[in-house]
UniProtKB/Swiss-Prot annotation:
Protein name: Small ribosomal subunit protein bS20
Family: Belongs to the bacterial ribosomal protein bS20 family.
Lineage: Bacteria, Bacillati, Actinomycetota, Actinomycetes, Mycobacteriales
NCBIfam families the UniProt entry points to: S20
GO biological process: translation
RNA-binding is among the record's keywords: yes
Length: 87
């Protein structure tokens, strides 16, 4: 337990940020999971719409500072490759 007042405040702030980031990361992972489920189902239309949703979620997470932009770009690229393999 911190004794310094500023550190006590930082601990509170860090905990709030951790919970917020955790929720955003979880939402992004859920959208990516839905995309992979659509790919496994072989439904190209559903996969395309889910790809759009997952990409948007990743972009929003980057804007909020949860993911680094290069990390999100790599994830989006990986999703696009999986979609293109569906043919």
């Amino acid at each position: 337990m911190a004794n310094i007042k500023s550190q006590i405040k930082r601990n509170k702030t860090n905990e709030k940020a951790r919970l917020r980031n955790q929720a955003i990361r979880s939402a992004v992972r859920t959208e990516i999971r839905k995309f992979h489920a659509a790919i496994d189902g072989g439904d190209k239309a559903a996969a395309e719409s889910q790809l759009r949703v997952a990409s948007r979620a990743l972009d929003k997470a980057v804007t909020k500072g949860v993911f680094h932009r290069n990390n999100a770009a790599n994830k989006k690229s990986s999703l696009a490759r999986a979609f293109n393999k569906l043919g």
